[in-house]
Amino acid sequence: MKFPGPLENQRLSSLLERAISREAQMWKVNVPKIPTNQNVSPSQRDEVIQWLAKLKYQFNLYPETFALASSLLDRFLATVKAHPKYLNCIAISCFFLAAKTVEEDEKIPVLKVLARDSFCGCSSSEILRMERIILDKLNWDLHTATPLDFLHIFHAIAVSARPQLLFSLPKLSPSQHLAVLTKQLLHCMACNQLLQFKGSMLALAMVSLEMEKLIPDWLPLTIELLQKAQMDSSQLIHCRELVAYHLSALQSALPLNSVYVYRPLKHTLVTCDKGAFKLHPSSVSGPDFSKDNSKPEVPVRGPAAFHLHLPAASGCKQTSAKRKVEEMEVDDFYDGIKRLYNEDNGPENVGSVCGTDLSRQEGHASPCPPLQPVSVM
């Protein structure tokens, strides 16, 4: 519930005070350990955090679940000396604890499914045993203030104090803008160099960098948030520099101008005398389907050429019963796609659609046709 004016500011200030107090009780200074075969190295920690981020998307869980799992993992590794061979089991146990703490009951993954689909290399019973060890070491206290909690609070205070903050981003609502910052924060949480800062410092540095891009008076608002959070300005400057470095590396790693091309199944559209389409095998290669459908298809980068070869109209030949059954199944498949995109036209439009597509293909000389929705009857 959002309160108007001063009441909203008081509520946000109260949330910030409680979160900072909670963080002060839980947070421990990160002491870098000498990498050996007997303890978890910083790079191994970053790899397992990135793995948890992938699990978050795989099981369609909240960002808060990943943030809490990451915080629990760091708290546990700061308390005990863990062997690297147990790291996956520790991480998946923290992930399961976070899911049970944050998610709704129907969204919590089934333990057997989680152990199987995550490829963690441990059984359900091993996860439960490790879960009990983690709870004992953390004194059964899982409710800690995560960097994502502080990001929500700082962003709400900034938007409330500076309503013009998002004027330069008219297409983004405050929640959409927060989602962009959340994605950046989750990336920074997988960087062990930022473990030297509290979660509140990390969130404020990210909000401050974003305000610097959007409004000219970002510095007074940053100082105001800094005073409310009772932080050291020199640490904030150092944290801003590291966050800016890691975010610049993230932007440079993104693919440029990625184009996702949809190719239909291995069939060609052929016109018939009655104004209907027939499906025949084509040399156009369609997508390869394997047993593992969980992996996304690799995007095609740069100019991509594809054609729908439409031979000249000819008389429709009598097909066998098996061919008719196959055509009915494919027609049902395409009917489902048309209904999904609200392109379910009546049969009277078949001839006009055919003529339009033929003229478009004949008149377009470029090997790369414009990316437009294609209606397949």
UniProtKB/Swiss-Prot annotation:
One GO process term, biological-process aspect: regulation of cell cycle
A GO term, aspect molecular function: cyclin-dependent protein serine/threonine kinase regulator activity
Signal peptide (UniProt feature, chain positions): none
CDD domains, sorted: CYCLIN_CCNI-like
SUPFAM superfamilies: Cyclin-like
Bias type Pro residues, positions: 367-377
Keyword Phosphoprotein: no
Gene3D superfamilies named in the record: Cyclin-like
Alphabetical list of SMART domains matching this protein: CYCLIN (SM00385)
Protein name per its UniProtKB record: Cyclin-I
Species: Mus musculus (Mouse)
Gene, per the UniProt record: Ccni
